[in-house]
Amino acid sequence: MDQFPERRGGTLRFANTAQETPIQEIWAYDVQPGQVPNGSAQLSYTVRSDIQPDYDNLAPLRAVIAGRYPSGERQTVIALPTKAPARKRPSDKAAASAQQPIVHILVPSSLGDPPPDQALMRSWSYGWENMHDGLDGIAITLPALNLPATHNGSIPLNIRIKDPIWPARDMIDVSVAVAPGQARTLWLDLRDRILSNDSLMLSIAAAAPGFDANALDGTQLQLVFKPRNEAIKEHVADRFNQVKDNWGFLVEEHTTSKRQLLYKRLDADITDLLRVDPDHALGREYWNDISYANQGTLPVEMPSVPKGVPAWAFWQLQDLSATRRYIRWWIEQRQVAYGDFGGGISDDSDLVQQWPGVALMGVDPDMLNASMLALSDANYRNGMFTNGLSTIETDELHSYEEGINLNSALLYLNWGDPRTVERLMETVKAFDNIIQVNPQGHLLFASNWFGGRKVYREPNWQWQKPYSFPIVHPAILLGGYNADPNSRRIVTGLADGYLAHAYTNAKGNWALPNEINWQTGKTRGGELFEGSGGADTLHTFWAAYRFTGEDRYLKPINYRVANSGPNGLSLLNENFLDVMGKRSDWSGKLIDAANKDDGSAPDFPHHVAWEQTGNLDYLAAIYRSEAREKLQNFYMNTEGHWWSDRVESPTVNLQRERLGGVALKRNQTYPGHTVSWRFNDPEAATQVAIAIPAPQQDRFTVIAYNTSNKNQRASMTGWNVAPGQWRITQGVSKGNDGKLDSNAKTQEVAFEKSASIDIDFPAGRTTVLQLERIAATTPVELRPDLGIGHGDVRVTADAIEVTVHSLGHADAPAGFVVLEDTRGELARSAFPALAAPRNLQPITTQVRLPLTNAVTLKTARLRVLTESNAPEITDLNNKLALPTPAKPATAKNSQ
């Protein structure tokens, strides 16, 4: 407890002494002499220790006392108005002597609930049932206590007034001291409440031995009320805060059963809020979420589509802008200089799985990447990695969420960055400790409880589970980046190991089990999709198919369709309909689903219906619905302060159209995006709508509408595209229907994964681009790759020291590091040929370039090139701005 002089305004700062320990409650009291206010009404009660607290409307409080307090802390008295019917309680001195010095005072909300077989009260009533005004506070007049002083001549008392709707919560908790033999009146100015019809409970504890029910006999209670319009403000504010806080704790997993007391408390809070303020807008939003939106839609003010703007384009940009606002809120309001968002770094790493897809769509890419890098720095600063896995031992899913998910997500925005690639390499190398060939010869997860320091291998921990599979993310990415044979071995081996346990179910159908025991090969948990996380396994099977082209890996994909229909594959990021050759077979069912008019159609059928018909209204329906939901739930996803791994502003549909496939959604680990975007004008990302129907690796179409009043230029980068020479045909669609007019222009360019093309979008027009590969070149992932990046450059007084990494599939030829600025080349230094990192160990060489006075560090950059100008996996990691020393040139400065 801290005391300080009266002050107005200012800031309170709280510093925790234990890591990640939240503040529970803060109480602040203004303690001074004063008078009990008259209020708009008063109700007076007297404590009667000789009277039975037997009114039926006190039964819930009697149950609370019996359930929450040990037998020696259950002394109970009743406070009644003078004329109230009462029943004498029998004397039990032996029981009273065994009690601790705490007494509970019960005050009935009305006198109309006497116990059975008792005289009824006639022609009189007393209480606060259905009272219009609000409770301001309670004055307690304590009788003179004939008890010994225990602390400096006084008797300390603790007084708690319980919340009528949830007696486990205090409306006030205050400690005072009184002198023996001296009566005192204490005015407790509560936070105002519009009381429900529930009865009231106070608990008073004393430090003095002998304090019991008889000591409080004659205590006077005055309930002072104030006008409703004054009291309602604090009531509504407090109840809403309680709803917000309690829902924040329950939002991850909950029932709607009031047998779960945390939910029962939340239900009481939201009910009391809406009882007093039934039109409370945020309260209604919370109740809509709590009740699973079963009571109809909420009103949301939506903008109108401007004249002349295609509806699909307008609503896509509204949808995207809502996500941008949400992400910016989290970065600007929650991310601190340390790098984390305050939700626990392992939960924060789930949050930022939403960042890459948005950045790749062109929205604030540098801000979002910086946010992720800062969180990654916090992760490593906190020591959360050991030997490529989580430092802590934890379950199969949370071991991924300790930062492996974050490292994986960073590659999408830092393609080829050596630090990012080598961190993933370290994790894939560590997989051999947890993914092993079992006695039956199948590659399976050998443990579901592990970390980088210890792997638990007892029988209870040897079950491979569906949630084991998200952690394969680094292997999937490296298998795509440089066709790393170790990564591909793990992906295909896990898929084969699972397929080896396929069986015929009771219906005679092919099926996969839910869990597999590594040691014995036994299975449990029913079929794969009958438990949690079953769909997460599909990305491993899809990756195995894309790495090898072997049809056996599609059996689980078809198994999913047999169970859930083609919409069950909507979690696959790539255009699986064309990859599998199933568009003609499955699109009809999806279009039928999209055309349902009962509002039940999910998003993916609308996407396919647009692809098949060209009707952009299907897209407009998706985006308008998403924009509406994001506006409705914005408060809960931001200022509602849910766990950071529970908030979401979905972008799967935005990514599928703008990127030609989904780059990343949490636990959807095989990248499927065709392209990404970076706009010269940072605001253009939310001004240019883009849709890419039915993309394939060797051809795709881009439909875009620029809603701004000026031309916009964007850099379009290839990802899931075949390398080679491409023909681009670009023109406008005068009818805004996505169909290319006849006066189009054609050009041919080299295009491949991570290569970029500049595209111009004229203002107020629909632009159509048709891209088709006309000549192939060497597969990107099979090439050598040299790179420099984070932490690879040190500037000293007279030199620049550079670490060059070999990151490719093939050995890298010899080359040079060149120092240059706007004037051209300033220095160069050679390095030898480097082997490929086939054993997942970093392969590097050190290069030193002289630093002369002619170098202007602010404009200088480093460039890596090979002697033969050999094509590499990517050129994105071949250039790096030169860091400016933060200290005098005599000291070294690491980037």
How would you name each of these model-derived features?
Residues 16, 702-708, 804-808:
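Asparagine-centered strand-capping/turn motif at beta-strand->loop junctions
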Residues 56-57, 65-68, 72, 159-161, ...:
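Glycan-recognition and catalytic cores of secretory/periplasmic carbohydrate-active enzymes
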Residues 136-138, 698-700, 712-714, 798-802:
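Structural beta-strand segments of beta-rich domains
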Residues 166, 175-183, 748-753, 759-763, ...:
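Short proline/glycine- and polar residue-rich coil/turn motifs
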Residues 1-230:
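Extended, solvent-exposed polar beta/coil surface segments
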Residues 745-782:
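C-terminal beta-strand-rich structural cap/linker in extracellular carbohydrate-active enzymes
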Residues 705-723:
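Surface-exposed beta-strand/loop patches in extracellular or lumenal glycoproteins
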Residues 568, 775-895:
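Extracellular/luminal regions of secreted and cell-surface proteins that mediate adhesion/ECM remodeling
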